[in-house]
């Protein structure tokens, strides 16, 4: 959420940010409601002052034996007007709050301006794609052939875009989770196993609601929703708290199932493990002082890239443009892994600096030494998406006979060098 005072004093900056991010919000209505609300509050304050003044006169006039009926009538009229204004103020505040929730975060000054993914900028590339001496198979064909992926039975049990992961591939999936968590805890992240049923306030706090509500699975008749990412519970773990400056930065690594309806994703990478309604992900979240958030973002990026390098998976880093960076992001890098069957790079991690956008919505502050509470900055990054990493390992480490060579860094977890039927 943006600071209303900033919106009030910098409407042109906010208007340009809306254009750059491709978001449509009635900014003029926000400004008009803000003016009306402040006028109402000023009038109420004046009326209350007048009522206090008049109420004192009543006692004095009564002692003097004078008629106070006119003054009492005035007090009644003042009370009626205050009630009328209070009712209107609640209406104005509710509408204003709803509109403020629709305002995206402002992009950082060094974020490229662009309408969509065509405006993203590649800033780094690591590793050379493997040259195969045999026809490359997509991971879904490899998995089905070794009886490690079963989409048909998953469709029978649940529906489309779900999967059973079995046998050696299930062990490889579990190995990836353990490797990711071990890698990050060794670098100062505290492991957290978060709840995957989240209330509405938490989704508003992290910024997914109201904009992305249609992409979330909700439990009918309740205030609960399934978690779309561990970012939501990890950020809201400190909602409505004032943190001691000495504990910053806070670093958490959370592992959870992720549930997404992906309402707008029809036809986009919907085969295999790339875009499923349920998947598992390891997530990095940090709470920092504002002046340290840029450094924290690069640390998160380095962690995501470091894990891919240990897996020896070629990747590239993309700086996302304004039109493709997301609603709440101040700055965002996507890490994309090479997928041989696609003959292109596919997103495997998004690393974002949210500045104070989530902290304002969730009311997360810290107290500097000797100062007033200030909003923290929050950051998050996939570390990594497990199903997509499994797919990347399968494709990049496939053998002509359909088996999968296990990356060396995972062998202590799998206790084998090859996955086969």
Swiss-Prot record:
| Annotated NCBIfam families | serS
Q: Which gene encodes it?
A: serS
Annotated GO molecular function terms are: ATP binding; catalytic activity, acting on a protein; serine-tRNA ligase activity; transferase activity
Q: Which Pfam families match?
A: Seryl_tRNA_N (PF02403), tRNA-synt_2b (PF00587)
Q: What protein name does the entry list?
A: Serine--tRNA ligase
Tell me, in a sentence or two, what this protein's role is: Catalyzes the attachment of serine to tRNA(Ser). Is also able to aminoacylate tRNA(Sec) with serine, to form the misacylated tRNA L-seryl-tRNA(Sec), which will be further converted into selenocysteinyl-tRNA(Sec).
Main localization category:
cytoplasm
For this UniProt record, the keywords arranged alphabetically read as follows: Aminoacyl-tRNA synthetase, ATP-binding, Cytoplasm, Ligase, Nucleotide-binding, Protein biosynthesis
Please state what class of enzyme this protein is: ligase
Q: What is the lineage of its organism?
A: Bacteria, Bacillati, Bacillota, Clostridia, Eubacteriales
Q: Which GO terms describe its biological process?
A: selenocysteine biosynthetic process; seryl-tRNA aminoacylation
């Amino acid at each position: 959420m943006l600071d209303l005072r900033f919106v009030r004093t910098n409407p042109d900056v906010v208007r340009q940010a809306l254009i750059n991010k491709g978001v449509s919000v009635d900014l003029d209505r926000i400004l008009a409601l803000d003016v009306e609300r402040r006028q109402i509050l000023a009038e109420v304050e004046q009326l209350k002052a007048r009522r206090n003044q008049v109420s004192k006169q009543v006692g004095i006039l009564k002692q003097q034996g004078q008629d106070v009926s006119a003054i009492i009538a005035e007090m009644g009229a003042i009370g009626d007007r205050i009630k009328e204004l209070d009712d209107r103020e609640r209406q104005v505040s509710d509408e204003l709050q709803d509109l403020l929730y629709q305002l995206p975060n402002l992009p950082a000054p060094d974020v490229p301006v662009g309408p969509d993914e065509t405006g993203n900028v590649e800033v780094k590339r690591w590793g050379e794609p493997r040259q195969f001496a045999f026809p490359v198979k997509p991971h879904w064909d490899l998995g089905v052939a070794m009886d490690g992926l079963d989409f048909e039975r998953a469709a029978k049990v649940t529906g489309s875009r779900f999967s059973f992961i079995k046998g050696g591939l299930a062990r490889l999936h579990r190995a990836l989770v353990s490797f990711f968590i071990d890698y990050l805890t060794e670098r100062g992240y505290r492991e957290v196993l978060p709840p995957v049923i989240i209330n509405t306030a938490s989704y508003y706090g992290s910024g997914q609601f109201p904009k992305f509500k249609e992409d979330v699975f909700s439990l009918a008749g309740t205030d609960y929703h399934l978690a779309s990412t561990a970012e939501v519970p990890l950020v809201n773990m400190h909602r409505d708290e004032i943190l001691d400056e000495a504990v910053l930065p806070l670093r958490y690594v959370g592992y959870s199932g992720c549930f997404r309806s992906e309402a707008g994703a029809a036809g986009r990478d919907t085969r295999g493990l790339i875009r499923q309604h349920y998947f598992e992900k390891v997530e990095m979240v940090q709470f920092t002082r504002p002046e340290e958030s840029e450094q924290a973002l690069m640390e998160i990026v380095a962690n995501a890239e470091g894990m891919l390098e240990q897996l020896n998976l070629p990747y590239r880093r993309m700086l996302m443009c304004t039109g493709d960076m997301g609603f709440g992001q101040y700055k965002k890098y996507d890490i994309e892994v090479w997928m041989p069957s696609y003959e292109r790079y596919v997103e495997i991690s998004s690393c974002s600096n949210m500045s104070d956008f989530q902290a304002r919505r969730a009311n997360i502050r810290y107290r500097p030494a000797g100062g007033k509470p200030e909003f923290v900055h929050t950051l998050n990054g996939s570390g990594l998406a497990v199903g997509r990493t499994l797919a990347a390992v399968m494709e990049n480490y496939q053998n002509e006979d359909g088996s999968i060579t296990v990356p060396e860094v995972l062998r202590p977890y799998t206790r084998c060098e090859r996955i086969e039927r």
